[in-house]
Amino acid sequence: MLQWLLGLFTSSASKAASRPVDQDVAAEPPPPPFLRRESMLDNHQQVAAYVFSVETPAAMQAHAWQVSTRKFFDSVLINHFVSDKLAEVLDKRLAFLPLSPAGLEHPALDKLPRENLVIEFDPPPGAEFDRTAVLARLIALHDSGFRLGCGHALAEQGLPEALEIAQFISLGDVTNQSPPDLLARCRLLATRYPESRMVARNIDSIELYQACQQMGIHLFQGRFLTHRGARSGSKIATYRMVVIDLLNAIKRQADFDELAGIAWRDPTLAYRLLRFVNSAAMGLREKIDRLKTAMVYVGRDELYRWLTLLLFSSKKPDHLDNALRENALVRAKLAEQLAAGRMPPRERDEAFVVGILSVIDALLEMPMQEALAQLSLPAAVAEALLHRQGKYAPYLMLAIACEESDQATIKSLADELGMDAFMVNQRHIEALTWAMSFSEALEESHLGE
């Protein structure tokens, strides 16, 4: 099944030529799209959902392309979830699947799991569609066990009945709405649809996220997580400074006695490192009690990778940092996967570290240059993080583009690496499922706390 799905993303001319052409289009179908992923947080600052999309390129929005292109793109998006691989997301998070009217009718929807999958219908202003047919289809999907998400504007678009069966109601782009208007809309929707959960989109700052929390909104999507602004007078916590000192000591080849001594400056950190080495994932036959022995067993490279993750830990639980860590893990694993076959193992490890450290400015709430000044990093790593240049930059930029950019940008970056949508999407899905499983293991074992 997975191989069949991945076949949808091959870009060979022979496959394109063999596809039937829709009657309303006389040109070649669009190239297979790249999968985009965006995090959605809840009121507890935890990653509650992912939104998956394969948007229609702007250049293909002419009338002759609209219906058939949207149908094709929706088909690709739906077939991602037919795959057992991406279906793993539904074991751990909600997944929002935005569809057009044509996508709502796709026969493969019947094969999708109902648990944690949200079918979303939120047409843009002025969109034309058969309201009677769409409402009938939404009711049928609801009755078959799917959760539904609908745009609040459907009430003004002649489809208020859809909101009555929706578990989620999207408020749209909240950055374009004044606080009084947004608050009034939230109160109205909460009164009319008390069982529904409201979703805010395109939140671009932590301040807007916090303001939306006060308005009774339940789910939050936007770049606020990875684009937290620098805070005046921001200081690095003592615990994190010990981690940074350890990272720098590893890079200057300090011996293991010195590394253990640095770690014991914070007993909590030393305990976490011992707990990591003795965890089931390491497969030890006998427990290791001495920190130096544990460090020798793990080795410098693996210890360095683990310590970069411990930067996201704190003395008391911080769900926002945990959410940021999961995002960093996806970036890191995707950058590493993209570099596979193109770089030797040591450089792939550094590509992983580049992905982790790409959010250190948001984590420490200070400019990237100031944050990186604390670390002794290889020049190529610093160059990628500060200037998006050097050998690691293309892998980092493509990993970030898969969560933030449009199709044209993702394709341009993929072309630089000689990769098509099939290859990038495959690695993206693998990185996401790995990151979620890894985050879950951290939380269950308390290793990341």
Show which residues each predicted segment covers.
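Bacterial c-di-GMP phosphodiesterase EAL domain
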Residues: 10, 16-115, 123-126, 133, ...
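Acidic active-site catalytic centers that drive phospho-/nucleotidyl reactions
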Residues: 42, 151-152, 266
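Soluble or luminal CAZymes and related metallo-dependent hydrolases
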Residues: 73, 181, 327
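Hydrophobic, Leu/Ile/Phe/Ala-enriched alpha-helical segments that form helix-helix packing faces
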Residues: 76-85, 138-142, 189-193, 339
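A conditional alpha-helix N-cap/helix-loop micro-motif detector
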Residues: 100-101, 131, 179, 252
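The catalytic core of metal-dependent phosphodiesterases that act on cyclic dinucleotides
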Residues: 111-226, 347-350
